[in-house]
Every structure is written in C-alpha cells, then in structure tokens.
Design a protein with these regions (language model features):
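Extended hydrophobic leader/signal-anchor segments used for secretion and membrane insertion
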Residues: 1-160
Length: 160
C-alpha cells in the first residue's frame, strides 16, 4: 500500500506533489476565479447558490461575444455579478414589450425561459461598452441589475 501512495522514489513523489500544488495555486490564484451565484437573476441557466468558475484569461486574445455569460465587477473588489452580454460596442439596445431589440431588430434568445414586459428606451453603446442582463426576465426591471458597462469591468468568462 505504501508503494502505491509514495511510489518507488519518495523524492520524486514529493516533487510531483509540490508541482501539483504550484499548478493549483497558479490556476486558482491567477486564471480561474470561483464565484457563487447569489440570487435568481440568472435562472434557469445558473441556479441560486451554484458554484461556478470564471476564466480571467478568456478575453486576452479576443473580445467578448453576444451571448457570453461573464462576471462583471459592479461595486468594488468583492462585488462580482454574473450577467449575459446582449449588446456589443456601437450597437443600439432597447427593450420593447419584453423583447430585446439590437439596432431595431429582435434578438433571438434561446436561453431566455421567463418572459417579461420590460420597456426601456434605446441606448447606443460606446466603442468600449457592452450591455448586460440576467436570464431571468420575470423579475421587475427595477429589481434587476443590468445595463451598460465598459469593457474594463468584465472580469472573465463563466465556464461552469
């Protein structure tokens, strides 16, 4: 049994353990950020209290895309929220009778399971701005964290 746990060479086993710990420290210290959902704004895609991972390096080589679920920083270092990107830089976003309009055309949202009756006047996004909203549209618009944020507020892409 000892041979299975330690192997034939205890020194090599120790080196492997140290390397594995180093990989985990780098992964969870710099690349992957665990985030817990608090609330129902992302139902049914992400249930309340579910644990997810955010890839902080996801947007180093390409820009965020419409439909990506991202973690955004809204209120200081610990104020992270999970939201879906529906509007990209330069686009005009509006809500009319619960439907999202991008540049005047209805956005197909296969992930949306709960309809709403939201109305929001058109807003044109700047060159570095995105429009975020949760998947659970059954909540009143006033109770829903949503809206326009600059690219710098995106922490990373949600993996799980």
């Amino acid at each position: 049994m000892r041979a299975l746990l330690i192997g034939r060479n205890p020194r090599l086993t120790l080196i492997r353990i140290v390397a594995l710990v180093a990989v985990f420290c780098v992964a969870f210290g710099f690349v992957l950020l665990p985030i817990r959902v608090e609330g129902i704004s992302m139902l049914p895609t992400y249930p309340n209290h579910s644990l997810n991972l955010v890839n902080r390096l996801a947007y180093l080589w390409h820009e965020p895309q419409r439909g990506d679920v991202v973690s955004i920083r809204l209120t200081g270092p610990h104020g992270l929220f999970m939201k879906r990107i529906i509007g990209l830089p330069g686009e005009t976003v509006a809500f009319v009778d619960g439907r999202v309009l991008i540049n005047g055309k209805i956005l197909d949202e296969p992930y949306e399971k709960y309809s709403c009756d939201w109305n929001r006047p058109p807003v044109t996004l700047g060159p570095d701005e995105y429009f975020f909203v949760g998947d659970n549209r059954s909540m009143p618009l006033e109770d829903h964290e949503h809206g326009v944020k600059k690219r710098i507020y995106i922490v990373g892409k949600v993996l799980l």
